[in-house]
Structures are given as structure tokens and as C-alpha cells.
Amino acid sequence: NRLSGQNHYKASMREEMDTDWDKGAMYGSQIKNRELNAYFKFGMPVGPGVYDEDQQDELRSNIAFVADYDRFRERAYFGLNDYDGTDNMVSLNMMYNHYFSFRHSLIVGVQSHLQFLDESLLNPTPWLDAAGAWNLDRQENEVGAYAEYTYTIKDKLSVVAGIRGDYNGYYDKFYVTPRGHIKWNITPTTILRGSAGLGYRSTNVITDNIGVLATGRHITFERPTALSAGAAAVRGPLNPGSAYGGYTTWMVADGGAGNFKALNRMEKALTAGGSLTQIFTLVKEEDATLSFDYFRTQFYNSVIADQEYSPNDIYIYSSDKRSFTDTYQVDFSWTPVERFDIFATYRYTNSRMTIDRPDGSTALVERPLVSRYKALLNLQYSTRYNRWVFDVTAQLNGPSRLPTQTGDLADSEMSPTYPMFFAQVTRKVGKFDIYVGCENILDYKQKHPILNADDPFSAGFNSSVIWGPLMGRKFYAGLRINFY
């Protein structure tokens, strides 16, 4: 649970905020999450085993059944915006793993995924003479089958090829997703990995973009360029006796979800890439490792929460326009002396998406609030038997593009580059680990993280543009018990 808001705001003040927002009431927000999970798995060996004399080991084919139930409830309000969602999910999976030999194996299975979602969203923005009340209830059931073949040569080569097909009842479509992975030990110290796979994901647009509720904007589930052509949408008065009486509301003819139901929430993306790892000697034999990674995710359909089209609105829509993310990463690890480890990493991200513009065109822009690069250096030293462990980390966070608040992309700015430092000391005493540490040692904080904070009940209010730490220097201490 999390309660926040203006100074001295309490949960008991919510009703006053709802009714007297225009009379100086305090702004507040609260998120309550509840989750219940149950899991069952049964497996048994079947058929004869395969024996490898070199490995002195036996593998048995097996069959397994897995059942998983998850219930997640989230209730949240941000000022006048109110969200209530319950997700009940049941997953059933039956699989058979067959070993032809130590080198060849095949996994086949069938799976069903049942999901029942009860969601409602109230987005009153009386300062814009508009509001939205949305019923987002839906049932998403999916059944499918899959197969995965693995070929392995110990310490040399591993090849995995898989495919699955799923029918989704909500979209009334059949989806095929092939995937592959290869690992090749070119030499004992040089390893090449590669993978590629097509993926689909049905998005939960509110919980995936919960930050849109922390604004004073009007939310619409439709492309801004198509808004005027929406035949199902109608405008009408709110109940005059409501807290926001007299203002108009954006409703739809089917009871509040017409535009939402027309939204194609099924994202489609292809991810491909690989890595090259080299183990080498600096001081003692094979004491260092250097690896290079590159992965690209190409979106063929993506869901966008666009707050840059208009200063008063947030448009949530699907787009098949150009959208991708390229990630480059270099990792270096070295143990120059016994019990002293050095780890360094650098990651560069080029993430772009296409958004609609008011003149009817589109623009390929840098994805907002995604750091262009991150660098990290970690030093760790432990005494004999790990009685003392000293850990220091330095982190450099690169700039990210901040979404424009005016609707004009020329007004978009970049966040600054900033460092972060962390330190921890651990003392081992028997089965106990006693530790003390400090986070954000330099006490770096984002300045003015809330836009238009002095007028929270307005379209200009926005507390979702967060690119840096909000908490300053933090000291902590703790105790761990090791039972094994």
C-alpha cells in the first residue's frame, strides 16, 4: 500500500477532495495491491532411460502437469482519477519431455490460459469540461500447443528450436510464435550465443501505463486523428447531482468501453541478437571475462500512451508504424587477486517509436524516459571465509528525452546525466550476516519532479515525468539468518 499527496494529506480526506477540489482541497493518491497465488505441479518418469557412459548419468523421459492460479486486485486513485481492477488468471499446462539420447530431446505440450478481468476507470477532468467513465471488463482465454527440440554436444554446441501456436478467443485469432537459440563454444574460452524469436503480448493498458493517472489530462482510448470519425462515441451531460455536476462526459454507446474494445492491444515484436564472450588472462590464468551483447526488438504493433499530441489529453492507441529498440552492452569482470572482484558494464540504448501529430503526419521520436546509456562499476572485497565483505558501486545514468507538455515536439528537453554511489559492509557471525550500507551517497535528487505542483487540479499537473531519484541519501542496517 502507498499513500501520498500534498503535505498533511490523509486517506480520510479523499471525500473532501472529490467534492471540494475547486475550493482548495488537498491533492492525494493511494495505491492498494492484494495478491493471492496457488501453484500445483505433478511429474513422473515414463519409458526407458538413456545412459551416457562418459557422463556416468541417466536421463529419463517424463510427463508433467502444472496448474497455476493467481488473483491480483489493485485499487488506486490519483486525485480525482479512480481505478479499480481485479485479475483472475488460471493456467493449465501439460508437457512431455522425451530424451532420444543425451544429445537429442524433444518437449511437446498443450496449455490453456484463462483470464477474467474486471476493470473500471473514472477519469473526471472538470477543469477541461470533460470526463470519462470506462468499463474495461473482459475475458481473455487462450489455448495452444508447443514443441521444442534441443540438440547438445557437451561443452561444444547447443541448439534449441521451438514453435508454438495459440488461439486467443478475445481477438478470435490464431498466433504462431517461432523461436530459436544457439550456443557455440568456439574454443574453451570463446563463447558465441545467438537467439531470435517472435512474440505476442496482450497489454493491460492502464496498469502498464499507471503513470497516466498521475496527471490532470483527459484520457481517450483512440487515435487522435480518428477521434472525430468515431461513430460510436457520443457526448452527454453528467448526472447533475454528481460531484462534477454540469460538465460533459466522453462516453460510448455500448456502456463505456466501445473505443477500448476497438483498440488492438495485442503487441507483436521480433527480438533477435547475440553475444560474444571471451575469457582471458591478465594476472593469473583465466581471471578476466569480456563480453559484447547486441539485441534488437522490432515492433510490428505496439500500444502507445501518447501525452505529446495535446497539452490537455493522453491518447492511448495502437500503431503499426516504425518502432524499435536497439541495445548494446559490454561487460567486463576481473579477479586480480583472491577474493577481490571487479565488475564493469556499459549499456547503450536506442529506442524509437512513431507517434501521431496534430497536422495529420507522424513523427519518429526517441522513446521518452528511456536512458540513452548506463554505466556501472562494482568493487567487492572479502576477507577469508567471507567474514567481512566490502562492496562499493558507482553508477552513471545517461540522459533521457522528456515528453513535451505543450504538444510541440520542439519543446522537448533532455534530462541531465547524473551519478549514483552505493556502499555496503557485511560482517558474518556464525549463521548471521550483519550489514550496514548507504544508498545515493551524494544525495542526488531530481529537482521539481512534479510539474505544476501548485495547481494539482489542472491539465498542466503531471507527476509521471520521473527520470531520477526522488529520495536522497539513505542509510540502512539489517540482519540475515542463513539456515543452510
Model regions and ranges:
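C-terminal beta-signal and adjacent terminal beta-strands/loops
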Residues: L396-P403, T426-Y484
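Membrane-embedded beta-barrel scaffold of Gram-negative outer-membrane proteins
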Residues: N62-R75, N185, R193, T225-Y315
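Surface-exposed extracellular loop regions of Gram-negative outer-membrane beta-barrel proteins
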Residues: E58-G79, D137-K183, W334, R339-N350
